[in-house]
Amino acid sequence: MKKNCFVRLSRTEFHSFYGVMLLCCAIAFAGCSGKSVNGNSQRGDDVSCLCPPTVYLQPYGNFTKNEASRLGKELEKHLLEMFNVDLDCEVLPPLPLSDSLMNKAKSRYRADKIIRSLSAKADDHNIYIGLTHKDVSCSIRGKADWGVQGLSLIPGKACVVSTFRVKNRHDFWKVTCHEFIHTYFNYHHCPKNDPSCLMQDAKGHPNYKNKKGLCGYCKSVLKL
């Protein structure tokens, strides 16, 4: 005769087991729920969210897959150090920069248009970062076409960064982290304007030389 494979629990044991299961489900749900931080919508309860996004690196033009792969490794390393987030960066095949993305008057590519094209591919479980060596621009501070190192939209799911205005290529990961933090955490610039903070507003004159990570204030806001 085939035996039934179950264990009979007392009422007290059943209630204890049921309570533990409910608690586990609640923790798992809270780990990936949205939360507001200092007025900014944050994708996860904290940066150790159970479901970190996949970061897709999209090279454009002559930005090679090897360059993107090296940058991806740097991002994974530094974001793990700063946020204890184990992200997976995946490099996509390079795409051409379409003429429709260019401001032909100044031979610059519109960063906002690049972001919109990337955002169309993104969802709540991934982030796209566009990579280019070409000059990119946006409308900011009363300027119709201002050259920038990078741009993100808050809230958003994509950003773009360019090496064109980065004086030291070893600082490019910092520029990329800056835009990633805007995008992933929907976090604005450092309120303290700390010159050592990666989230300091460059105000048209970016300098990442002495920036290694976030200042104490930004860490506290993001609850790191």
Segments predicted by a language model, with ranges:
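Hydrophobic helical h-region of N-terminal Sec-dependent signal peptides
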Residues: G19-L23
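Fold-level signature of zinc-dependent metallopeptidase catalytic domains
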Residues: L50-E67
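C-terminal motif of bacterial Sec signal peptides marking the signal peptidase cleavage site
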Residues: A30-G31
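Metalloprotease/metallohydrolase-associated module, dominated by Zn2+-dependent proteases
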Residues: D145-D171, Y187-L224
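Catalytic glutamate of the conserved HExxH
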Residues: V175-Y187
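N-terminal secretory signal peptides that target proteins for export/translocation
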Residues: M1-F14
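Cysteine-centered motifs
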Residues: C5, C24-C25
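Metzincin-family zinc-dependent endopeptidase catalytic domain
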Residues: S69-V175
